[in-house]
Regions:
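Long, contiguous, compositionally biased segments that the model treats as domain-scale units
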Residues: 1-140
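Active-site-facing alpha/beta catalytic cores
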Residues: 76, 81-325, 368, 393-395, ...
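Glycine-rich, charged/polar anion/phosphate-binding loops
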Residues: 53-55, 275-278, 305, 334-336
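Anionic group-transfer/hydrolysis microenvironments
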Residues: 72, 112, 294, 354, ...
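Non-transmembrane, aqueous-exposed alpha-helical and coiled segments at domain scale
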Residues: 302-305, 311, 317-349, 355-410
Length: 449
């Protein structure tokens, strides 16, 4: 399809006539339309120029000259949008990025799964407890978590609350990443504390090398003013069309549509039907976009998604986020890499080592084994090395807090420990320590690359 036709603003609503999945059953659609009209009048959360910069950065990652780090909550909550929680999450990502930058010897693109990750796809529309059946919790943007009829009824006012919470989160992120909080020397000093913990001795070498590198830069007169600020982008799953569509704006410079709710949006595994509403809408916006690919994805599906979403083969436009499961990635990923490589397309390949590795403990906790997460990351790198393509990034669910949601890691969280601090309303996240440990392990893989 010719790009001008594809980016014609009048076609931005073509999705409305197509099959759509995973939307709330709004009790009163007239109110949704009123809220949408109000959202359409709100200022954009991000700017087209920033979105274009991100696309340029992602193009570098797709060609092996940068690495994407994407992380944040499984599902953000309105109550969780506090300064402390946001700061800790940003801090964790910055700490991971320093380690990855050193291990990769190349720039790391920092992106929060933040400031918009309020909607969740569900495997079932309804949830039953005892003899009561209510709508499933679809994230704070749609309904409440409490299991009552009032809480679980989708409320369009939540779309506005999601916008305002995203705006205040983004304001803090911008302040933290531009105001000196992100100073490289400061971030590295936090990491030294991690590496000095006896449980993490194997990472001491890397931390010491980074230390020497920073001292060398200081001695050589490097411009540390430049290193006090970092570029930090936002991304979320673009799921709720009644939120994403009103925040889609026409760029005054080019006359083309941008989704201004985030720099980067992705399509989930459950909503990537080639003839569905989400794929159509995503094909018409200028943002860099992602698609989640599970272990059953066929090479033909991957190629069809490229044709539909990136017909111009534009560098940085399309990211494939693979979520295979540790036991499946070594079989499922290479055929996709081969087929896409042979087609000449060059999407960015990113691993999501979280979503294919869920388990439920006998006590009923949803959890993931840290060893499985690590194994999937290793399988991702192995597949790329075998095929001769670039392992371009990692997508993780994490928090900056000391929660106990995933099993293992140097703190050796076991099933009995999960109950001490399990806070996620959705999927289990890596805690602060596990996230840093993952960064050191990925850095070791990057050094081999």
């Amino acid at each position: 399809m010719h790009s001008t036709a594809r980016l014609d603003p009048s076609a931005l609503d073509a999705w409305r006539s197509l099959p759509i999945k995973q939307q709330p059953e709004w009790p009163d659609y007239a109110e949704v339309e009123r809220v949408s009209a109000e959202l359409a009048q709100q200022p954009p959360l991000v700017f087209a120029g920033e979105v274009d910069s991100l696309k340029d950065r992602l193009a570098q990652a797709a060609s092996g000259r940068a690495f994407l780090l994407q992380g944040g909550d499984c599902a953000e909550t309105f109550a969780g949008a506090t300064a402390d929680k946001i700061r800790n999450r940003v801090k964790t990502l910055l700490q991971m990025a320093v380690v990855l930058t050193y291990g990769a010897s190349m720039p790391v693109i920092k992106m929060g799964r933040m400031a918009g990750q309020f909607a969740k796809p569900r495997s079932s529309d309804m949830e039953t407890r005892g003899d009561v059946t209510l709508p499933a919790y679809r994230g704070d943007i749609a309904n409440g978590y409490d299991f009552t009829a009032v809480s679980r009824t989708p409320d369009p006012q939540r779309l506005l609350k999601a916008y305002h919470t995203s705006a205040s989160t983004l304001n803090l992120i911008r302040a933290f990443t531009q105001g000196g909080f992100a100073d490289l020397r400061e971030v590295h000093s936090w990491n030294k504390g991690f590496a000095e913990n006896p449980a993490n001795q194997r990472y001491e070498r890397l931390a010491a090398e980074i230390d020497r590198a920073i001292k060398f830069m200081e001695a050589a007169g490097a411009d540390f003013d430049e290193l006090k600020r970092v570029e930090f982008y936002t991304g979320h799953e673009g799921l709720l069309m009644d939120y994403e569509r009103p925040l889609t704006r026409i760029d005054s410079r080019t006359g083309t549509p941008y989704n201004t709710s985030a720099h980067f949006v992705w399509i989930g595994e459950r909503t990537r039907d080639l003839d569905g509403a989400h794929v159509d809408y995503f094909s018409r916006i200028r943002n860099p976009i992602g698609v989640k690919l599970g272990p059953t994805t066929s090479p033909d599906t991957a190629l069809a998604l490229i044709d539909k979403l990136d017909p111009e083969r534009e560098p940085g436009r399309l990211t494939f986020i693979t979520r295979m499961g540790a036991g499946k990635i070594r079989d499922a990923l290479p055929p996709l890499l081969e087929a896409v490589k042979d087609s000449g397309a060059k999407p960015l390949w990113v691993t999501d080592p979280m979503h294919g590795n869920g388990i439920t403990t006998p006590t009923g906790y949803k959890t993931r084994r840290f060893d499985d997460v690590i194994d999937e990351v290793r399988g991702f790198f192995e597949a790329h090395r075998a095929v001769g393509t670039f392992p371009g990034g990692i997508h993780v669910e994490l928090t900056g807090d000391d929660v106990t949601e995933c099993l293992g890691g140097s703190e050796q969280i076991d099933e009995a420990t999960l109950a001490t601090r399990y806070e996620s309303l959705c999927d289990p996240r890596l805690n602060h320590m596990q996230s840093l440990e993952l960064a050191f392990l990925v850095a070791e893989e990057l050094e081999k690359r």
